[in-house]
Amino acid sequence: MSRIAKAPITVPSGVEVVVNGQNVAVKGNKGELVCLLNDAVVIKLEEGVIRFAPAEGFKDGWAQAGTARANVNNMVLGVTEGFKKTLLLQGVGYRAQVAGTIVNLTLGFSHPVAYQLPEGITAVAKSQTEIILEGADKQVVGQAAAKIRAFRPPEPYKGKGVRYANEIVRRKEAKKK
């Protein structure tokens, strides 16, 4: 049984939540997010508090209710504070520039890599080797960061590549003769 689903979500001031059947729309100063919940979840909005419970006749009701609660809580946090991912580029000649919604990366290939940011995501190049991605949708921010990292993931021998700011790269020792 999920303990996460039992905890209610208090809606902060300045955030508007609309529940229409299984659709939940959350609107705040950072934007608007919409989510479709599983049929195994019953959602109730009363007096600025959102509560979740499993629907009758579903085997995995509590698990789905816990997932729905986590998703809606991330939506509320996203429209109030937003989410941020920092990427670091390590390697000789590895550079990043941001031009509007396109991130241009020089990662040691014979050609530069241009990544089109998804809608609702903003990028700032703090330096030539640091990119900060920000947005209201946690999943989209993480997915964009993962796609940029996938162009050149950190390799274990020298540590060169694109990494998250808090990522620890496991290093290997070079082969000895």
Swiss-Prot record:
InterPro entries the UniProt entry points to: Ribosomal_uL6-like (IPR000702), Ribosomal_uL6-like_a/b-dom_sf (IPR036789), Ribosomal_uL6_a/b-dom (IPR020040), Ribosomal_uL6_bac-type (IPR019906), Ribosomal_uL6_CS (IPR002358)
GO biological process: one example: cytoplasmic translation
Keywords on record: Ribonucleoprotein, Ribosomal protein, RNA-binding, rRNA-binding
Gene Ontology, cellular component aspect: cytosolic large ribosomal subunit
Molecular function GO terms recorded: rRNA binding; structural constituent of ribosome
Record carries keyword Zinc-finger: no
Keyword hit for Cell division: no
Family: Belongs to the universal ribosomal protein uL6 family.
Subunit organization: Part of the 50S ribosomal subunit.
Task of the protein: This protein binds to the 23S rRNA, and is important in its secondary structure. It is located near the subunit interface in the base of the L7/L12 stalk, and near the tRNA binding site of the peptidyltransferase center.
Protein name: Large ribosomal subunit protein uL6
Source species: Psychromonas ingrahamii (strain DSM 17664 / CCUG 51855 / 37)
Gene name of the encoded protein: rplF
